[in-house]
Amino acid sequence: MNAARTGYRVFSANSTAACTELAKRITERLGAELGKSVVYQETNGETRVEIKESVRGQDIFIIQTIPRDVNTAVMELLIMAYALKTACARNIIGVIPYFPYSKQSKMRKRGSIVCKLLASMLAKAGLTHIITMDLHQKEIQGFFSFPVDNLRASPFLLQYIQEEIPNYRNAVIVAKSPDAAKRAQSYAERLRLGLAVIHGEAQCTELDMDDGRHSPPMVKNATVHPGLELPLMMAKEKPPITVVGDVGGRIAIIVDDIIDDVESFVAAAEILKERGAYKIYVMATHGILSAEAPRLIEESSVDEVVVTNTVPHEVQKLQCPKIKTVDISLILSEAIRRIHNGESMAYLFRNITVDD
């Protein structure tokens, strides 16, 4: 497309070729070309970004997929956004299918809400809008001072189930923990299938029995009620792992938003096999697949892992043929087209509920 006529350009902020595949798919659907830029790491480890064409007065979309080197990808995005802001781009929209640090969106003891810090950094760098997909916590949208479109991958995964899983009508949707039950219920209702929930082996949070007090107790407590102590939350017990729901003689489809460390999925597959499931699928939006994930999946009872291409995982697919990919470039390219043309985004969220 002619940049002067359309008034928008699409750039990729990734410095590695493997991470630009999604950007190429999106631009092909738009009938556009990737903007001319150079992103690379200098010998001293610093990230450098050079914009090789005029972007003055245009809508700029930066596509940034997150590889294993998360911090480098974040710096690439920040520096490119700032470079485009300095070059007088009209609007700078970040297309970040998997939003990094989304697991650090809650306060834990003396930690910090890193996701909120990243949101502030992106705004300071010059971003005016973000398109993302299946945020780990929907409340993350409130961290931003500009619009965030949180698209859903579930329509693509539901379509995969209907078209690629033989005899899917004999399947049951499984939540690998009670926390994932709402997502699993949404899938089950749309496919008119049964629901099962795996419960047990609850992970205890870190206990801190030292109250950190160096001062003497309150005078009233010390004199009137010497035995009074602050009530403490009871520690969680670890009940035996169990499956709530019937999976005997069925296909089990475990659904979640992120597959990173796969030990919990492997354990879930084992218990489902013991309970009579004859085939097991794992489906998620973001396939991070860290560390030994490909080997563990290959050696496990899981028959197939289905993820979208929000995160590049071609190396993991070579290591484990069980991993399959669903392309979501269609919805991202449509979102870009609608935002640039000032059209409603409501159609992309049709039939989406708060539990999706």
From Swiss-Prot:
**What's any GO biological process attached to this entry?**
purine nucleotide biosynthetic process
Task: Give one Pfam family, short name only.
Answer: Pribosyl_synth
- List all membrane-crossing ranges: none
Q: Does the keyword Nucleotide-binding apply?
A: no
- Let me know which tissues express this protein, per UniProt: Ubiquitous.
Q: Which residues constitute the signal peptide according to the record?
A: none
Highest taxon of the source? Answer: Eukaryota
GO MF terms here are: enzyme inhibitor activity; enzyme regulator activity; identical protein binding; magnesium ion binding
A Gene Ontology CC term for this entry? cytoplasm
User: Residue positions of the PTM Phosphoserine?
Assistant: 177, 215
The record's annotation in SUPFAM superfamilies points to: PRTase-like
**Modified residue N-acetylmethionine is at which positions?**
1
By sequence similarity, the record places it as follows: Belongs to the ribose-phosphate pyrophosphokinase family.
Q: Which PANTHER family does this entry report, sorted A to Z?
A: PHOSPHORIBOSYL PYROPHOSPHATE SYNTHASE-ASSOCIATED PROTEIN 1, RIBOSE-PHOSPHATE DIPHOSPHOKINASE FAMILY MEMBER
Partners and quaternary state?
Binds to PRPS1 and PRPS2.
Q: What is this protein called?
A: Phosphoribosyl pyrophosphate synthase-associated protein 1
